[in-house]
Amino acid sequence: LGKKVGETIHPVSLLHSTKISPNKLNDIPAEVFESFVLKKLEDGVRRFHVTPMFFGPTAAILEYMPQRVEVMRATWPDLEVRISPCVVDLDDPGDERMAQILIDQIHASREKCGFTSPSIALVDHGAPRIKVTEVRNHLGEQVRRLLPECEFPQVVACSMERRDGDEYAFNEPLLERVIGTEGFRNEIIVSMLFASPGRHAGPGGDVAKICEEAAESHPDLQWQMSELVAGHDGIIDILAHRFAEGPPSDPVS
């Protein structure tokens, strides 16, 4: 991304990544947003541009980050943070680049497994904000429109998990409830709306376990998880576009 936009890009997590041993990160310690910003503030930096590697407008970006900026601004009143749009912008419904990444990964999975007419379960983590699920559903609609129905008979957008309570029913259907339904009993490609591997999306992760458990109840089931989004070069083009959209935006207040 840095090469694409001609700037130095710092890979920074919002939370948690400092728990990972540097030994697993080529001996480069992970950094998280608040401590990174504070360190740069002490070095004299006052302006920051955040390009989110988030598919949709999560509470982390819309609520948590602005709250932390407000706290830091109490000590550093001239702190300025601008945030680019997320990877998928629902205000630009004609942008099919993210859907095309998913489609490329679907085709690669189909070729790898030799499937003839697989159904597609497009799965995300499952978020407590309906706007994030709207992104999932939007991508599902785009993928359905762009894939030939004669080769891919069904496309269903679903979530890996959801919170309890009717107020989170918008995350339905869950992946575990999709597998085994009509059209999802034989060849299935699980299209992974996940950026990178971890305890959910990695080998032996939660998504794989859901598929493995479903296969025990459906002996004809053949399934394959697609590669993850960060492994596709196209994500760099999208992030570069979002980066370019960042500077004109209003600073976080």
Q: Where are the predicted features?
A:
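Extended amphipathic ligand-handling, pore-lining, and cofactor/metal-binding catalytic surfaces
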Residues: 1-253
